[in-house]
Structures are given as C-alpha cells and as structure tokens.
Amino acid sequence: MNEPIVRVPWPSRDSGGSDATLNREWLVTNGLGGYASGTLVGIIARRYHGYLVAALPAPFGRVMMFNDLVERLEFPSGKLYQLGGEERAGVPLKMEAAEHLAEFRLEAGLPVWRYELESAVIEKRLVLPHGQNSVHVNYRLVSGAEKVRLMLRPSVHFRPHEEAVSAELDAAYVLVVADDRYEVVLGEKLPPLRFLLYGSRAQLTVDKLRIQQIVYRIEERRGYPARGDLWSPGYFHAELGPDADATLVASTEGWECMYGLKPSEAIAAEQ
C-alpha cells in the first residue's frame, strides 16, 4: 500500500514571525544512522541542520559533511530569486523562500517543496537512498516557463554532528575535479564529499569562498555557541525546462555506488 501524502499548511498561521517560521523543520534518515534536516524555508538554524550527516565507521560516527545549499533561480526576464541560505551576523534576515513557497508536503516520508515564482511552478524533492551516505536533491520545472537557470552553491564544515557550530573551520579544504566528478577533500582521515550534477548544461564554476559569521538562531536561543563559518568550492548550474530536471547528488560513497543509482531510480525506490 502506498503511504499517504502529508501536506503541511503553508503559509501557516504562525509563519509571520522569523522565530516561529524557523521552528518548522523536516528530517529524513538513511537507515544507517545518518540523516538530513533543516527548516522548511531553507535557513540553517541548528547545528544539526544539513543536507548530509553521514554515518561513518568508528571512530568517526555521525559527521556533518554537507551543511548548506544556497539555491538561486534566474528567469528569462533576468529576474533572480534566492531560496534558502544563511543568516549572517549584522545582516537583516531575509527569507525569500517563504514568500514563494506555495506548499510543503511529505511523499512516502520524503520532503517536497512547491514554489511559485513569476508564472512558473518549480518543485524541489530530497531523497536519502536507504543504506547509503548519499543525498539526491532534485529540481523540476512543473509549468509556466520555457527554461529557468538553476544555480546551487554548496557549503561545508566537516565536523561531528554534535560539535558546536563555532568549531574552527579548517583552511585545508581542497576541490578535486575530474570530468563530471567533483570532490571536496579534507586530509586523509575522513572520506571526501563527492558531487555529481545531472541536468542540461550542467557544470561547476569554481569560486572558492569562506562564508563567515553565520548565525544559527535556534542554537542562539538555546544558549549555545551560535556563530560559525562554512567553506564553499563554487556553484553548480544547470538549465531547467519542461522535460529537463536537474539533480545534485552528494555522497561519501564511492563513485561506482553513485553512478549505480540514477536520480529517477533513487526516487522510485523510496516511493
């Protein structure tokens, strides 16, 4: 029997305030002890928020490997929209995603965001394949535009998932590129974080960046260290169209494992 679709009312009656909005969260697990979690509006606010907390062999345990993903959409009109992101110290918090989020739902326990921007409808879907330290983030143009340019900036801070966000960010991250394979490497102890981008005109623009003084509002409210830095290798981009989805895959698994499960297969396997 298929699991029911659970729809979360949005805008909600408590979505007017920033703190209340950031309290609306999601969580997905991978069957290994790893997980992904975040707020519905895409702002990281806890030390546990991230796209991939990998369950690694001892002595590492659960490690935050893929912290955040800033999403931008550029329309043929030239208009640019940002979804998600970070709150920065001294900068007013903007939750642009909240203005355009028409619906959030769970399909078979997996989160789906439905955005309405200009005349277009775009859906984002997140899948953690069972038994893998991997995450698939899929974007689909449902209707309303011939094409939309998608830009994705991932950022990382490899750390134990319970460690404070203020822990020092290592300066030795290295980006390794070979054809369509991208790896973020930090020394020899932890596995690299590997990326694949499926989509039309998919590529990476190398633009290394240290994102400083991110505020984790829920950590701050709880009295814990609440400011930290992330490192980004650059940004991926692809073109969305009526028959052209895009999927970013991030994983600590080997390349054979990543290539062995296509995005459509990952979605079908979890439904």
Predicted regions and their residues:
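Terminal accessory carbohydrate-recognition/targeting modules of carbohydrate-active enzymes
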Residues: 1-271
